[in-house]
Swiss-Prot record:
This is Uncharacterized glycosyltransferase RC0461. Signal peptide: none annotated. The keyword Cytoplasm does not apply. It holds the Pfam family Glycos_transf_2. Gene3D superfamilies: Spore Coat Polysaccharide Biosynthesis Protein SpsA, Chain A. It comes from Rickettsia conorii (strain ATCC VR-613 / Malish 7). GO terms for biological process: biosynthetic process.
């Protein structure tokens, strides 16, 4: 064990004032004063303030027995806050340390905390820690360790430990400057004067958690909070005032978002306190945060106006009412009069017309004009379920995700159910696996406006541009997945058998090119090989299905130009994919990028 002689002298050898307020405390105060006198750090003053005790002079006799070892003051009864204020006004130290008359300091309490100050650049930091809980006779009950409740980094976020009930006033070592800058204890509050003042001070002061247990806190029936009848009501009022006074920035700093802070505060109050009114207020405020959150729904449109109108109507019936719809007309050639008429009827719908440049450019225009906190994408031929935005918004706020997607239903051209796709199981840290398997469907995606402002769709890509962006986002962020079908994705032709192999193959090659052409993503090029190998397998299955169908419809297949074209594209696609795989393996990434571009011009 290191002795005091072995320890270096404190560079910062400041005077610390230990203030002991007492009312009728002759039973315990001697232990408290003795623990203060036993401090290994000697540059201290001990101030005992008798708050008008009515115990036939017992409290005063105990205090006077210490002579000039302590500074003793007597005042008329005014409550704990008034006694502390009296001591503060008479203290000479640069730092304040509160010791309740029924609590006990460990001998190294002050020295240890001053040592911590020596290691910190900012000497205006408040030091605090956990404590040992003891009974009336001084027997240990248990240890209260804040670091078992919150991670260390959160314990150093001003206000958060206080609002999770983790601050014991007697564990603090606090610069006295804050009494001059912020104020002293509110003497009108009999039992909550401490948290009231800590709240005000912690809003402006840095804090530092130390895991050492340095105080013993006595739990007994004579404590003020147990004897004062309106304690719970006083606490309800105090906590409600906290919730009203906190700024959005403070809530974000503590828990990542106002919604998350409010719901976690409600959970804390419900599980750890009887303060029902404050708990109900936190829940009400959390719901209001969701209601006040605007969602920007971006719908690119190119012809198929009847489907686009269906898509718009699926947004208009959302249970979450705070939204805007951005219709991006990507140079439609069909009659759009019915579409524009709907847009003019609802102020929440904004209509933009642009020349045809593809879905990526259309979505980017929507992103640049969006004003919501979150963006949700909806293709003009797809649909939202009515609670889609409500469920996804709550999920993202509760889990602090900046990007999420959900499972979905496939429907045919007439809106009939085909199957469920449980893509929402694809969640968490999905990179680099997302390169070879990206199940994220466009109308299931929601993300923050900031995320998409910083990550626009690649406009030079018209097929596979969505997967390219999802891969890029997943390489830097965790992906939130909801395994609940909240959107309907329309499949042209009603079945995957008739998908466009041309578009499919171009999309795969575009994704491969995008990955290989990115300095960071290209490090994971083997995943593109796996992606293309999987594509070959899928195309082979497609070809087999077509062959089976052809046998039962020989004359139809012989005379159908579209079917013959699909078969040709399937063959060309497999050739291109296999050439890509061979090129990556034999010639490397850069040569493959150049070759891909030549393939696209020659074969597609």
């Amino acid at each position: 064990m290191t002795t005091r002689k072995d320890k270096p002298l404190n560079i910062y050898h400041t005077l610390v004032s230990i203030i002991i307020p007492v009312y009728n405390g002759a039973n315990y105060m001697k232990e408290a004063i003795n623990s203060a006198l036993a401090q290994t750090y000697k540059n201290i003053e001990i101030i005992v303030v008798n708050d008008g005790s009515k115990d036939n002079g017992e409290t005063e006799r105990v205090a006077l027995s210490y002579g000039d070892k302590i500074r003793y003051f007597y005042k008329e009864n005014g409550g704990c806050g008034s006694a502390l204020n009296y001591g503060i006004k008479n203290m000479q130290g640069e730092y304040f340390s509160w010791l309740s008359h029924d609590d006990i300091y460990y001998p190294n309490k002050i020295e240890h905390q001053v040592d911590i100050l020596n290691k910190l650049d900012n000497k205006d930091t408040i030091i605090y820690g956990g404590y040992e809980l003891i009974d009336e006779k001084g027997n240990s009950l248990r240890y209260i360790k804040p670091d078992s409740v919150l991670p260390i980094n959160k314990l150093n976020i001003s206000l958060l430990p206080l609002l999770r009930g983790l601050i014991h006033g007697c564990s603090l070592l606090m610069p006295a400057k804050y009494f001059h800058e912020v104020g002293i204890f509110n003497e009108a509050l009999p039992t909550t004067q401490d948290y009231d003042l800590w709240f005000k001070i912690f809003r402006v002061a840095p804090i530092h958690f130390d895991e050492s247990i340095l105080i013993k806190s006595r739990f007994h029936s004579e404590q003020g909070s147990k004897k004062i009848s309106n304690h719970n009501e006083e606490c309800n009022v105090l906590w409600s005032s906290f919730l009203h006074e906190l700024t959005e920035e403070e809530m974000i700093k503590m828990e990542g978002s106002p919604y998350l802070f409010l719901t976690r505060t409600a959970t804390f109050l419900s599980n750890n306190t009887p303060y029902k009114k404050a708990c109900d207020l936190a829940n009400t405020m959390a719901k209001q945060v969701l209601n006040d959150t605007k969602i920007s729904v971006i719908i690119p449109v190119y012809n198929r106006i009847n489907w686009a109108i269906e898509a718009i109507k699926s947004v208009l019936i959302q249970t979450h009412k705070n939204f805007e719809i951005l219709i991006i007309d990507d140079g439609s050639t069909d009659d759009i009069s019915e579409l524009t008429a709907i847009c003019k009827k609802d102020k929440r719908i904004k209509y933009f017309h642009k020349k045809n440049e593809g879905p990526a450019a259309a979505r980017n225009l929507g992103i640049k004009n969006a004003i919501g906190k979150y963006i949700a994408f909806l293709d003009s031929d797809d649909l939202f379920y009515k609670d889609k935005i409500e469920i996804q918004l709550k999920f993202m706020e509760e889990n602090n995700f900046i990007f999420s997607h959900t499972s979905y239903h496939k429907i045919n051209e007439k809106g009939k159910y085909i199957e469920s796709v449980h893509s929402g199981l694809f969640s968490g840290n999905v990179f680099p696996q997302v390169i070879q398997t990206c199940p994220i469907a466009m109308p299931t995606v929601m993300g923050t406006l900031t995320l998409f402002q910083e990550n626009l769709f690649p406009e030079n890509i018209r097929s596979g541009e969505d997967c390219c962006l999802w891969i890029s986002i997943a390489s830097k962020n965790s992906i939130g997945g909801i395994d609940k079908e909240l959107s309907k994705v329309r499949i042209s032709g009603g079945t995957n058998t008739f998908m466009d192999p041309n578009k499919y193959s171009v999309g795969l090659i575009n994704i491969t090119s995008y990955v290989l052409n990115d300095a960071y993503l290209s490090k994971f090029s083997p995943f593109t090989i796996n992606l293309l190998l999987a594509a070959v397998t899928q195309l082979r299955l497609l070809e087999n299905k077509n062959e089976d169908y052809k046998k039962s419809n020989i004359s139809f297949f012989k005379n159908n130009y579209v079917i013959q074209k699909i078969r040709t594209y399937c063959f060309v696609t497999k050739i291109l994919i296999l050439l890509t795989i061979t090129s990556i393996r034999q010639e490397g990434i850069r040569a493959t990028i150049s070759r891909i571009q030549r393939w696209l011009k020659k074969h597609i």
